Regions:
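Short glycine-rich or small-residue beta-strand-to-loop segments that form or flank ligand, phosphate
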Residues: 8-13, 37-39, 65-67, 88, ...
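N-terminal beta-loop-helix "entrance" segment that forms/cooperates
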Residues: 38-60
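Short, solvent-exposed amphipathic alpha-helical segments in soluble enzyme
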Residues: 25-31, 55, 82-84, 133-134
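Short, ordered loop/turn segments at secondary-structure junctions
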Residues: 16, 41-43, 70-71, 92-95, ...
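Helix-adjacent hinge/juxtasegments
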Residues: 55-98
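Short glycine/serine/threonine-rich phosphate/pyrophosphate-binding segments
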Residues: 18-22, 47-50, 69-78, 97-100, ...
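Glycine-rich phosphate/diphosphate-binding loop of Rossmann-like nucleotide-binding domains
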Residues: 4-45
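C-terminal binding/interaction regions
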Residues: 7, 13-20, 24, 99-163
Length: 163
């Protein structure tokens, strides 16, 4: 597959309701001109879809997977168990425990099955996209340059004094 056809990042989530958080990943990746795809894949309700996605991700041109999940949040860990690609887990804020259940589920992986765990909710989704950009930037100087420009712009936007 040629470099231009690589999707590079796959954003997956357990349900449609998770999209309101995971859209923040898309927004950052768009700003950085990183190709991505977005899918709904439930570890519990669509296990065959999850399995096929995970075992074929690398063959399909994916470099990094960002997986958002709420509640028991098994999606990132199950995907990580099936691929050696980097998997970044975004805990989705839930009504019952405010996402703490998701955070603990994603963070407490057994040794040998790593998931890079981010913060709960919007901040985690944004940072997952930035971390994916950092990973891709290791081998893609264009992405690295865009990421450095993004961070410089972020720094410049901070006022030196309060108004």
């Amino acid at each position: 597959m040629t470099k231009n056809k690589l999707k590079k990042v796959s954003i997956v989530m357990g349900s449609q309701s998770d999209y309101k958080t995971m859209i923040f990943c898309q927004n950052i990746l768009k700003k950085l001109n990183i190709k991505f795809e977005t899918k709904i894949i439930s570890a519990h309700r669509t296990p065959k879809r999850m399995y096929e996605f995970a075992i074929n991700a690398e063959k399909n041109g994916i470099a990094v997977i960002i997986a958002g999940a709420g509640g028991s949040a098994h999606l990132p860990g199950m995907i990580s168990a099936l691929t050696s690609l980097p998997v970044l887990g975004v805990p989705i804020e839930s009504k019952k425990l405010k996402g703490l259940d998701s955070l603990l589920s994603i963070a407490q992986m057994p040794k040998g099955i790593p998931v890079g765990t981010l913060a709960i909710g919007e901040d985690g989704a944004i940072n997952a996209a930035l971390l994916a950009a950092s990973i891709i930037g290791l081998s893609d100087l264009t992405v690295k340059k865009k990421l450095n420009q993004f961070r410089l712009s972020q720094t410049k936007s901070v006022k030196k004094k309060p108004k």
